[in-house]
């Protein structure tokens, strides 16, 4: 190859490579303006995405479009894990729609927007979690310590979907479900609050004093689902989470926590098996544009590795 052709070839690689990389991040959702700019709570947001009619994402103006669409893609992948354009579990879909499920995206936990939002959120609905700008990394979907999107979206779907639809499996109270019975085994006993130290044979030992029993159960469900997806098995992550969660690979999960492995992998339960990669654009997808009536209830905001001590508690009247 002569020098001219070499230069052309190298130039072509340099030019084409970014296009190929960008082409890998495909999200077939439309970013819109906030449909309720004058609402006392939702007026703090300027950006909006409707995800399969199930989750409505509201974001502050300084959150990049890329990050908002990343949340939308991850949410869609968790709801439609086979990416055929349809939510995998119709009952979960119905619950999320009926409860007007919302995911707020804030610049920071210290800003005025989050206080204004919750102070004025005065009607029924479902907010299972929030996410902050610095917790979102579209380049590392679900990677512990870098991208909390998978965790916070799972908390939202589980809180507003699974706990509501399948209480025998997922109710969060002590002695109430398969989930909490399994958690009592994983923690080495039934501890309503953090016991200070856990039995030596436990493998789930969450140590956040602000997290009550129900919060512990929600975190446990998250760990089980993402472990089965093989999101946590790299050496750095395993070491980083060992103080809280020991079986960091699917193989260890199967061998250690047989109760939850059986629940998570049972096809009848229709839990997501594949880790989101931040791409969602099924050829058969019908991306809907329904805007639900504003009506919300705040569910517990479960901690994440970025803000492990964040606690949001609001007393909201049932009717504004």
Positions of predicted regions on the chain:
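Acidic/His-rich structured neighborhood in mature extracellular/periplasmic domains
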Residues: 42, 52-195
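Bacterial Sec-dependent N-terminal signal peptides
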Residues: 1-24
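N-terminal low-complexity, Pro/Thr/Ser-rich intrinsically disordered segments
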Residues: 24-49
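Low-complexity, Pro/Thr/Ser/Gly/Ala-rich linker/spacer regions in secreted
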Residues: 22-26, 278-294
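Post-HExxH zinc-binding segment in Zn-dependent metallohydrolases
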Residues: 161-237, 244
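A general structural signal for short secondary-structure junctions and capping/turn motifs
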Residues: 2-4, 48, 92-97, 211-215
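Pan-zinc metallopeptidase signature
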Residues: 214, 221-284
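Glycine-centered coil/turn sites that cap beta-strands in beta-rich domains
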Residues: 288-302, 306-320
